[in-house]
Swiss-Prot record:
GO cellular component, one term: nucleus
Organism: Rattus norvegicus (Rat)
UniProt-listed InterPro entries: GCM, GCM_dom_sf, GCM_large, GCM_small, Tscrpt_reg_GCM
Name this polypeptide is given: Chorion-specific transcription factor GCMa
One of the GO BP terms on file: astrocyte fate commitment
Main location: nucleus
Length: 436
């Protein structure tokens, strides 16, 4: 159908050119937006069309210089294909969208094919007389005029949405691959069978002879008790507190000293006390917070032996595994080592333990004010198995400790309860070892 057959208004609509000074404005019907415009075509879009406002096209177009500022000119870049002409699993060919920038496009050609890792190549567009196909855009009044010159001589590249989706999938694959490589490069550290655990993972326990150099005179009683103490340590480890009722947070300042210096200081202070004919009160071997609940372990019937039986006790007054003791500071300002309050030395009774009374003697008339239910020592010293304080008592194995005076004697029932609790704790530890 020729132009002469149309009305003058229709002829004006069909015969317009993008470079005309005046474009038709009596357009009654606008066109639908075309995503793949090809060949020599013209379209009139509404100014409200969002795609026309953005000058979109599925062809890879870039802006080119134009002497007319009212007209936007775009040229086709062609398509990037695989030099091996490979296909995906779905049977599609690899037609990538060329980059807009010249340097980015040159860099893109040096990359490998995303499907077969083959080299890529660019197929330029030569559909307009040996030149790229050109698109023209012009805004005039209520319409947007579009005109294409030339016919594309190459396959259609992937759209922008498809290119963005492909890049996103590539990033996801790269992230998963890098994470898997990191997992393989840093496997979990697992302990080998029979491997000794590190010291940081072991509980805090006191070894039997940890850093203490003992004189030859003290080796015999300690070595005799070493197997028993080691077996107790193997069965039950205490976190630096030997009170079964709970850990004690208070600690004596002298516990931070070097063991050798601590031993020498205590040896010196003990020698001064012995020279003044004052003797230490032996520590109570079982001071617990739950003393009221342990009254059932009192009396001789529970122990099953007489209080004057010396075969059960060691030749020195303190056992190796002693419990926390209350040490009061010395009244002399020149002495800084913890000492116990000395008592008046009465007449010595050979053949009897210093904690027990003379058989047939009078009962004790006064009691030492000691509250076992709320025992909070002013200065509490945690005595481990290798405590140098214990060694000072062993320095006088031949000396017999005298009975305490009547003015400061312990009540017989309280002493029996303390000794019964000590015996009960030893039996409980042995039972735990046998169960383990």
């Amino acid at each position: 159908m020729e132009l002469d057959d149309f009305d003058p208004e229709d002829k004006e609509i069909l015969s317009w050119d993008i470079n005309d000074m005046k474009l038709p404005q009596n357009v009654k019907k606008t066109d639908w937006f075309q995503e793949w415009p090809d060949s020599y075509v013209k379209h009139i879009y509404s100014s409200d069309d969002r795609s026309a406002q953005r000058h979109l096209s599925s062809w890879a177009m870039r802006n080119t210089n134009n002497h007319n500022s009212r007209i936007l000119k775009k040229s086709c870049l062609g398509v990037v294909v695989c030099s091996r002409d490979c296909s995906t699993e779905e049977g599609r060919k690899i037609y990538l969208r060329p980059a807009i920038c010249d340097k980015a496009r040159q860099k893109q050609q040096r990359k490998s094919c995303p499907n077969c890792n083959g080299p890529l190549k660019l197929i330029p567009c030569r559909g307009h007389g040996g030149f790229p196909v050109t698109n023209f855009w012009r805004h005039d009044g209520r319409f947007i005029f579009f005109q294409s010159k030339g016919e594309h001589d190459h396959p259609r590249p992937e759209t922008k949405l498809e290119a963005e989706a492909r890049r996103a999938m590539k990033k996801v694959h790269m992230a998963s691959a890098s994470s898997s490589l990191r997992m393989k490069g840093r496997p979990e550290m697992k302990g080998l069978p029979g491997e000794i655990p590190s010291q940081g993972s072991l509980p805090l326990t006191w070894s039997f002879q940890e850093g203490v150099q003992l004189p030859s005179g003290y080796s015999t009683p300690l070595i005799a008790n070493a197997p028993q103490q080691n077996s107790l340590n193997d069965c039950l480890s205490f976190p630096k507190s030997y009170d079964l009722g709970g850990t004690t947070e208070l600690e004596d300042p002298t516990s931070t000293l070097d063991p050798t210096k601590l031993y020498e200081r205590y040896k010196f202070s003990s020698s001064k006390v012995y020279s003044a004919e004052d003797q230490f009160q032996p520590p109570v071997p079982g001071v617990y917070g739950d003393y009221d609940e342990a009254q059932t372990w009192n009396k001789n019937a529970v122990l099953g032996r007489s209080p004057t039986d010396d075969t059960y006790y060691p030749p020195y007054p303190l056992p190796v595994a002693s419990w926390p003791c209350d040490y009061l500071p010395s009244q002399s300002s020149l002495e800084h080592s913890p000492q116990q309050v000395p008592l008046e030395p009465p007449a010595a009774q050979p053949g009897h333990h210093p904690l027990w009374t003379n058989p047939g003697g009078e009962p004790y008339e006064e009691k030492v004010p000691v509250d076992f239910s709320s025992y909070v020592p002013s200065v509490t010293y945690h005595s481990p198995q290798q405590d140098p304080f214990l060694l000072a008592y062993g320095s006088h194995p031949q000396q017999q400790y005298a009975l305490p005076g009547k003015s400061n004697r312990w009540d017989f029932d309280e002493e029996m309860a303390c000794m019964g609790l000590d015996h009960f704790n030893n039996e409980m530890l042995l039972n735990l070892c046998s169960l383990k």
